[in-house]
From Swiss-Prot:
HAMAP family: ArgB. It is an enzyme of class 2 (transferase). This is Acetylglutamate kinase. It comes from Nitratidesulfovibrio vulgaris (strain ATCC 29579 / DSM 644 / CCUG 34227 / NCIMB 8303 / VKM B-1760 / Hildenborough) (Desulfovibrio vulgaris). Its EC number is 2.7.2.8. GO terms for molecular function: acetylglutamate kinase activity; ATP binding. The gene is argB. It catalyses: N-acetyl-L-glutamate + ATP = N-acetyl-L-glutamyl 5-phosphate + ADP. Catalyzes the ATP-dependent phosphorylation of N-acetyl-L-glutamate. The record marks 32, 253 as: Transition state stabilizer. CDD domains: AAK_NAGK-C (cd04250). The lineage of its organism: Bacteria, Pseudomonadati, Thermodesulfobacteriota, Desulfovibrionia, Desulfovibrionales.
């Protein structure tokens, strides 16, 4: 491709993005950052540049990040045993100390540094800062057919009870990009490890964000033939639970999306974080790079049976 043809292609891409830039100008977009996109150096740099560009054109990104592999690596180095129940890390006091150290002290600051180098004014936060994420201990009960319900003690695993939107709005107005580590605190000062998808969904709901984006290590929601499902409404998404389409880690991600939509978020996207510039491709182009779940008020009642 010669220089002129390349310039024409670039101009076409810019024109295609114009209606989306208008649509999202001044709006909040919450992005859950995790998976391979946090490990590959090229993807890390692209992510930071994507976020910086969004802020530059008047869109307000709020980032919530994970860090499971980094936590696991540090626990192994410290010879602290760790195990999972129902996909959640059982978190005793020693594990909680490591979780907070890794997420807040290391991973969060690395992301903030990368974004600042890209030109964004990023500010690192945990749920403790300004009581940003109020939490409580998660209660988990597993019911199996013909068996008594099993109560699982996950230790210091929490669930979100409230979000300090005043703090986040203040940072947005002053031109900052909040970068949130998924550590919460209760009214007694107890610290909790919270699933990053759940925090992202709760933040999006509290801010009434225009979009919620969850970066994953798959193309999006796949059907039984392993083909990408590009768009579903809430009712269709609920049906994916009952027909067996959703399995493993995709189940809590879709639940998180539905909860956010139920609280007023317009669309939630599960996108392929392995694709360079996936955020810009999803938000500012016609096709996108994942699965969108669209708010459907008529379907909200059907969601209650899945979410509660």
């Amino acid at each position: 491709m010669d220089c002129v043809e390349n310039a024409r292609l670039q101009s076409k891409v810019l024109i295609e993005s114009l209606p989306y830039l208008r649509q999202f100008h001044g709006e909040t977009v919450v992005i859950k950052y995790g998976g391979h996109a946090m490990k590959d150096e090229a993807l890390k740099k692209a992510f930071a540049l994507n976020v910086a560009l969004l802020k530059l054109v008047g869109i307000n990104p709020v980032i919530v990040h994970g860090g499971g592999p980094q936590i696991g690596k540090m626990l192994e180095q410290l010879n602290i045993q760790s195990h999972f129940r129902e996909g959640l890390r059982v978190t005793d006091d020693a594990t909680m100390d490591v979780v907070e150290m890794v997420l807040v002290g290391k991973v969060n600051k690395e992301i903030v540094n990368q974004m600042n180098l890209a030109g964004a004014k990023a500010v690192g936060l945990s749920g403790k800062d300004g009581m940003l994420i109020r939490a409580r201990k998660m209660e988990m009960v597993i019911s199996k057919e013909a068996q008594a319900p099993e109560i699982i003690d996950l230790g210091k695993v929490g669930e979100v009870m409230g979000v300090n939107t005043t703090l986040l709005r203040s940072l947005e107005r002053d031109g900052f990009v909040p970068v949130i580590a998924p550590v919460g605190v209760d009214d007694n000062g107890e610290t909790y490890n919270i699933n990053a998808d759940a925090v992202a969904g709760a933040v999006a709901a509290a801010l009434k964000a225009k979009r919620l984006l969850l970066l994953t290590d798959v193309a999006g929601i796949l059907d039984h033939d392993k083909k990408l499902i590009r768009s579903v409404n809430m009712r269709e998404a609920v049906n994916l639970f009952s027909d067996g389409t959703l399995t493993g880690g995709m189940i809590p991600k879709v639940k998180c999306c539905l909860e956010a939509l139920e609280e007023g978020v317009e669309k939630a996207m599960i996108i392929d974080g392995r694709t360079e510039n996936c955020i810009l491709l999803e938000l500012l182009t016609d096709k996108g790079v994942g699965t969108e779940i669209v708010s459907d008020r008529a379907a909200q009642a059907a969601c209650n049976c899945v979410l509660r």
